[in-house]
């Protein structure tokens, strides 16, 4: 078989990945692109100059790996989130990776995997089940309310009955935009019998509710 005729179906993929469709967010030529969470305003000249200067400085060390723990970045992120949420956070509370999808994958590699389950409340962010499949974590789901907000009674019942190892709650929800109150997150946490709750706050700057980091000291 010549290389130019090889298709994805010819490759030795895992059986559970065959027939799956890749994730993709449409790249639309419109001023506001909330589907990809992009800032509609271009960076200022001062910011561009600052980034260029920082890249030039870092380029002198391109022959070395960067800090694998990203301590400087995590320090700055902790300061930003402390100011944004009012909850004191330190480097130990933060992890950094190449986008939130990589973080989600790392979480499921650590806390999901074969023989474990993850649950989400749909419709919600489509990457949650895709990453679950990719990490061989069995995907479970429960429905949201008619307005696509989180039906907390349904969520608590699903968590209690199905005992998932990982629970996904998106706040604000993607794509419908509703935020989840802290009291509802407490109910989910209290219903869990082990495992971890992942509150996906990718659109946190648009939230109408406090960040879930406010619950760290209690749980």
Swiss-Prot record:
Q: Which GO terms describe its molecular function?
A: histidinol-phosphate transaminase activity; pyridoxal phosphate binding
| Entry EC no(s) | 2.6.1.9
Please name the CDD domains in this protein's record: AAT_like
> Could you mention a single GO BP entry for this protein?
L-histidine biosynthetic process
The alphabetical list of record keywords is: Amino-acid biosynthesis, Aminotransferase, Histidine biosynthesis, Pyridoxal phosphate, Transferase
Q: Does the keyword Heme apply?
A: no
Is this entry keyworded Ion transport? no
Which pathway does it operate in?
A: Amino-acid biosynthesis; L-histidine biosynthesis; L-histidine from 5-phospho-alpha-D-ribose 1-diphosphate: step 7/9
Q: Which cofactors? A: pyridoxal 5'-phosphate
Q: Which reactions are catalysed by this chain?
A: L-histidinol phosphate + 2-oxoglutarate = 3-(imidazol-4-yl)-2-oxopropyl phosphate + L-glutamate
- Which superkingdom? Bacteria
Q: Which family does it belong to?
A: Belongs to the class-II pyridoxal-phosphate-dependent aminotransferase family. Histidinol-phosphate aminotransferase subfamily.
Question: What is annotated about its quaternary structure and interactions?
Answer: Homodimer.
Q: Mind telling me what this protein is named?
A: Histidinol-phosphate aminotransferase
Question: What is the protein's species of origin?
Answer: Mycolicibacterium smegmatis
Primary gene name: hisC
């Amino acid at each position: 078989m010549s290389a130019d005729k090889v298709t994805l179906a010819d490759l030795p993929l895992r059986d559970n990945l065959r027939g799956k469709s890749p994730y993709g967010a449409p790249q639309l030529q419109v001023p506001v692109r909330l589907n990809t969470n992009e800032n509609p305003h271009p960076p200022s000249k001062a910011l561009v100059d600052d980034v260029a200067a920082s890249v030039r400085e870092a380029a002198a060390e391109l022959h070395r790996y960067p800090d694998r723990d990203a301590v400087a970045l995590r320090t700055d992120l902790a300061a930003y989130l402390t100011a944004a949420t009012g909850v004191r956070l330190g480097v130990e509370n933060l992890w950094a990776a190449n986008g939130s999808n990589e973080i989600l994958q790392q979480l499921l590699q650590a806390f999901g995997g074969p023989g474990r389950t993850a649950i989400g409340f749909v419709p919600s962010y489509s990457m949650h089940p895709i990453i679950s499949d990719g990490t061989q974590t069995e995907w479970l789901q429960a429905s949201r309310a008619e307005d696509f907000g989180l039906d907390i009674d349904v969520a608590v019942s699903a968590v209690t009955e199905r005992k998932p190892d990982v629970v996904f709650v998106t706040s604000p929800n993607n794509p419908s935009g509703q935020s989840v109150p802290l009291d509802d997150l407490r109910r989910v946490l209290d219903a869990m019998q082990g495992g971890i709750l992942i509150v996906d706050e990718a659109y946190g700057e648009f939230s109408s509710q406090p960040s879930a980091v406010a619950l760290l000291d209690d749980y």
